[in-house]
Curated annotation (Swiss-Prot):
Belongs to the tachykinin family. It is found in: Secreted. Its main location: secreted. Keywords: Pyrrolidone carboxylic acid, Secreted. One of its GO terms (cellular component) is extracellular region. Expressed by the venom gland. The modification Pyrrolidone carboxylic acid is found at Q1. This is Tachykinin-like peptide-IV.
Amino acid sequence: QKKDKKDKF
C-alpha cells in the first residue's frame, strides 16, 4: 500500500 495524496486509506 502506497500513501498517495489522492489515496487516503
